[in-house]
Swiss-Prot record:
Gene field: ABHD12
One Pfam family recorded for the sequence: Abhydrolase_1
GO biological process, one term: phospholipid catabolic process
Full protein name: Lysophosphatidylserine lipase ABHD12
Keywords: Endoplasmic reticulum, Glycoprotein, Hydrolase, Lipid metabolism, Membrane, Transmembrane, Transmembrane helix
Glycosylation, residue list: 123
Protein purpose: Lysophosphatidylserine (LPS) lipase that mediates the hydrolysis of lysophosphatidylserine, a class of signaling lipids that regulates immunological and neurological processes. Represents a major lysophosphatidylserine lipase in the brain, thereby playing a key role in the central nervous system. Also able to hydrolyze oxidized phosphatidylserine; oxidized phosphatidylserine is produced in response to severe inflammatory stress and constitutes a proapoptotic 'eat me' signal.
Organism: Macaca fascicularis
Spans traversing the lipid bilayer: 75-95
Catalytic activity: 1-(9Z-octadecenoyl)-sn-glycero-3-phospho-L-serine + H2O = sn-glycero-3-phospho-L-serine + (9Z)-octadecenoate + H(+); 1-(9Z-octadecenoyl)-sn-glycero-3-phospho-(1'-sn-glycerol) + H2O = sn-glycero-3-phospho-(1'-sn-glycerol) + (9Z)-octadecenoate + H(+); 1-(9Z-octadecenoyl)-sn-glycero-3-phospho-(1D-myo-inositol) + H2O = sn-glycero-3-phospho-1D-myo-inositol + (9Z)-octadecenoate + H(+); 1-(9Z-octadecenoyl)-sn-glycero-3-phosphoethanolamine + H2O = sn-glycero-3-phosphoethanolamine + (9Z)-octadecenoate + H(+)
Amino acid sequence: MRKRTEPVALEHERCAAAGSSSSGSAAAALDADCRLKQNLRLTGTGAAEPRCAADAGMKRALGRRKGLWLRLRKILFCVLGLYIAIPFLIKLCPGIQAKLIFLNFVRVPYFIDLKKPQDQGLNHTCNYYLQPEEDVTIGVWHTVPAVWWKNAQGKDQMWYEDALASSHAIILYLHGNAGTRGGDHRVELYKVLSSLGYHVVTFDYRGWGDSVGTPSERGMTYDALHVFDWIKARSGDNPVYIWGHSLGTGVATNLVRRLCERETPPDALILESPFTNIREEAKSHPFSVIYRYFPGFDWFFLDPITSSGIKFANDENVKHISCPLLILHAEDDPVVPFQLGRKLYSIAAPARSFRDFKVQFVPFHSDLGYRHKYIYKSPELPRILREFLGKSEPEHQH
């Protein structure tokens, strides 16, 4: 009995051991399977996170682009609206065009004392004020010939006025729009002319610089006439030449036409960078480029100029001028196109009023870079003036 029992016990032990072994293997397999699934979940999560981040980044970028495009569209619509509104605004308010032509509110250089021309290197210049009309006062500079600069030190206005009766010729300079009589390029021209032995008298029109009054073509012309008469009353038989630059050429031809009509013409007229008339100049000006082909350009932009009483008709005035005429123009002038100066010459040269006087056109090559206001730099300018102002016989040349 003991022998039979022992095998049975051993068999049970083997079965238990086998069962235990089987159970451990299953547990191990189950544990391995759990770890594998966990690893797979972790791996899947790690791959999904970059994809989600990329999607979010793309959405943000698209949002920024959309916002930028909306802002850009808004800006474009505003610019377009302004572009369309400006012509109507100018048509309804012609005074805007007048301000853009005169630009008297632009005072360059800033922070200079016009009462002290010596601060601009003009140490032989006197500042004083004249009154062309009631409630109108204009500031004037009188620069004597450079050879007198030592004698001029400390002298008063009376000395300068008496000096006009000396044997030196006088140039009345009429500046263009914007700035004052103290503008840098203007001061440099005064110095050149003074070094050549001329008196230079210049002034700011009413509404410019420290001059009092409201700008207008009539007012500017009257101011110039008043200064001319003031000079003639003190200069005796000395030659008086009138020099106009840019917009000042319009004032100059207005003045000289009036002087010729009253039979008191100047000894010569010099026009630097002139135009034919203000309508053609406005149409050719760089500011008009963006509107030049705008429907109704003349009606919107040019007619308001005329309705404001602004013409500056050089092309008409030269037909009534009887004195020598010199025209100076740089080929690279970006403000008053060179062809307008040449066109003015072609109108003046055959005019009957000039049949007894010389008319000369002097171009300056674009390579020289004199542009609109630097002709004073030309080393040829002294010779040109000396030869032109020294001649008296009728002559047309260019």
